[in-house]
Structure formats: C-alpha cells, structure tokens
UniProtKB/Swiss-Prot annotation:
GO terms for biological process: heterochromatin formation. The modification N6-(2-hydroxyisobutyryl)lysine is found at K6, K10, K37, K75, K76, K96, K119. InterPro entries: Histone-fold, Histone_H2A, Histone_H2A/H2B/H3, Histone_H2A_C, Histone_H2A_CS. The modification N5-methylglutamine is found at Q105. It comes from Homo sapiens (Human). Gene3D superfamilies: Histone, subunit A. Residues 7-19 have a biased composition (Basic residues). The modification Symmetric dimethylarginine is found at R4. The modification Citrulline is found at R4. This is Histone H2A type 1-A.
Length: 131
C-alpha cells in the first residue's frame, strides 16, 4: 500500500519550547525575534536569547522577591508600585542599576535630614542635677 495515513513511519516527537529546554519562564523565542527585528546586529547566535532571557528572569525574580517583602511589611497581600519603589531604592545594587528610572505612583523614600531633627536636650536630667 501507499505510505499515506497515520500508520507507518516514525511518530513525530512533541515539540519542546526553547524556554522549557533552558528551564526558564521567560520566552526565549520571543526574545530571539525581538533581537533580530531590533537591528542590534546582523546575526544573532542561538545562545544569546537564552542568556538574555535568563538574566531578565533573574532580575525580575529579585525585584519581585524584595517587593513582596515590602508588601508583607506593610501588611498588604498585593504588590503595588510603591512596594516596587521601596524594594529598588532600598537595595544598593538595584538602585544603581535603575538609578535613572522613574516608577509611576512610586513615591519617595522617607528621609529626614539630621540637621532638621529637633536637638536632643538634657533638660530633665540636667535640671535634676543642678537643684
């Protein structure tokens, strides 16, 4: 008989995404496409989008971890831009990396200059000694 139909021949293996091969959540294929379309270079190696996806995933996980801690500290269950701002600005390395970035609805870090604080006076202790 002819070789038509579903019988015969090897069954084609289920396709596996490059993200799952690399053990990543971020889309390797999409990043590869964006690198090609972005005119960053004439050619893009096969490992470049995997590496970039891994770096982006790591940074995202790091920021979300710190923002989750900030939301828990504020007794909230949902991460809001304020929590992202607090997470980034309180971390030295992330603050340096994202120094020129403005986060909408993020607010500012609470900070009062030392010279503006009321002076510590020894009034109670000093008056008791002088009597």
């Amino acid at each position: 008989m002819s070789g038509r139909g579903k019988q015969g021949g090897k069954a084609r293996a289920k396709s596996k995404s490059r993200s799952s091969r690399a053990g990543l959540q971020f889309p390797v294929g999409r990043i590869h496409r964006l690198l090609r379309k972005g005119n960053y270079a004439e050619r893009i190696g096969a490992g470049a989008p995997v590496y970039l996806a891994a770096v982006l995933e790591y940074l995202t996980a790091e920021i979300l971890e710190l923002a989750g801690n900030a939301s828990r500290d504020n007794k909230k269950t949902r991460i809001i831009p304020r929590h992202l701002q607090l997470a980034i600005r309180n971390d030295e390395e992330l603050n340096k990396l994202l120094g020129g970035v403005t986060i909408a609805q993020g607010g500012v870090l609470p900070n009062i200059q030392a010279v503006l604080l009321p002076k510590k006076t020894e009034s109670h202790h000093h008056k008791a000694q002088s009597k």
